[in-house]
Amino acid sequence: MFGFLKQVGDYTRDAVDAARNLAQGFAVTFDHMQRRPVTVQYPYEKLIPSERYRGRIHYEFDKCIACEVCVRVCPINLPVVDWVMNKATKKKELRNYSIDFGVCIFCGNCVEYCPTNCLSMTEEYELAAFDRHSLNYDNVALGRLPTSVTTDPSVQPLRELVYLPAGEMDPHTVSADRPRAGKLPAEVLETLAPVKDEGQSSKAVLKEDA
């Protein structure tokens, strides 16, 4: 008698727990059903990268002086600089320059320390290939002009959540030309003015609001 009642109690407890777990799962599902869609239909829709996005490295062959600073500051000594010494001019002659993006960690050290600014970071991130050797870009591939999400006619640009205008939560309903929430880095710099104090180096202070 008591064993039967214990089984009924255990069954009832398990049924209540199952119903509670099911209700919690449906609560999460219904909560998401009320939200607006945020899924990006890639590759027809792409998010606009941030201003400081570190994508594929762009290289300008004419500016390079083969100083190999990029090789020394690279954590993995990745860039390959092939040069020969011109005995007539006693200067280096650059023959080839390559970077393997299959190994690159996109830290940006080479771009930051380049004395001639021949390297720059772009917003390209589509570097997938069937052969890993295809990721080894020479100076010709590195010199290709970068593409932009906002200028590609076959792509609908979408802003990330942090770059949406104030009050907007859905990137699908916001056009690319609407002002974002907050100021761009260039706009922030415009609000700074150099001021020299006696005995101190010049520093930037915020302009007084008009």
From Swiss-Prot:
Binding site for [4Fe-4S] cluster 2: C74, C104, C107, C110
InterPro entries per UniProt: 4Fe4S_Fe-S-bd, 4Fe4S_Fe_S_CS, NADH_quinone_OxRdtase_chainI, NDHI
Lineage, uppermost ranks: Bacteria, Bacillati, Cyanobacteriota, Cyanophyceae, Synechococcales
Gene Ontology cellular component annotations, sorted alphabetically: plasma membrane-derived thylakoid membrane
One Pfam family in the UniProt entry: Fer4_7
Key words, A-Z: 4Fe-4S, Iron, Iron-sulfur, Membrane, Metal-binding, NAD, NADP, Plastoquinone, Quinone, Repeat, Thylakoid, Translocase
Primary subcellular site in the record, as a coarse category: membrane
Cofactor binding summary note: Binds 2 [4Fe-4S] clusters per subunit.
UniProt EC number: 7.1.1.-
GO annotation (BP), single: photosynthesis, light reaction
Organism: Synechococcus sp. (strain CC9902)
Protein name: NAD(P)H-quinone oxidoreductase subunit I
